Amino acid sequence: MPDLMIDHREKAHALLKADADKILRLIEVQIENLTMPQCPVYEDVLDTQMYGLSREIDFAVRLELISEIEGKALLENLEKKLNILHEASQNTL
């Protein structure tokens, strides 16, 4: 049974990481092709996606599939990458 729990934890972490990567790709495409970061639509999409991911992470933490520290690290890592992306888009204006 412990091996099964480890597998579920690894799978939960991988799924959350994949969702974070999808958000990053979505925002990259939006910045490159659709709108500027100051656009309300951009901000709404980003806020909605980040909120959704935070709820997924909270759910996984409550099920003890990942630790609270791992969840925070996933969000912080995504936020850092998004900030870098945002700064790069500002420098190209």
Swiss-Prot record:
InterPro entries the record matches: UPF0358 (IPR009983), UPF0358_sf (IPR036270)
Protein family: Belongs to the UPF0358 family.
Listed name of the protein: UPF0358 protein OB1428
Species this protein is from: Oceanobacillus iheyensis (strain DSM 14371 / CIP 107618 / JCM 11309 / KCTC 3954 / HTE831)
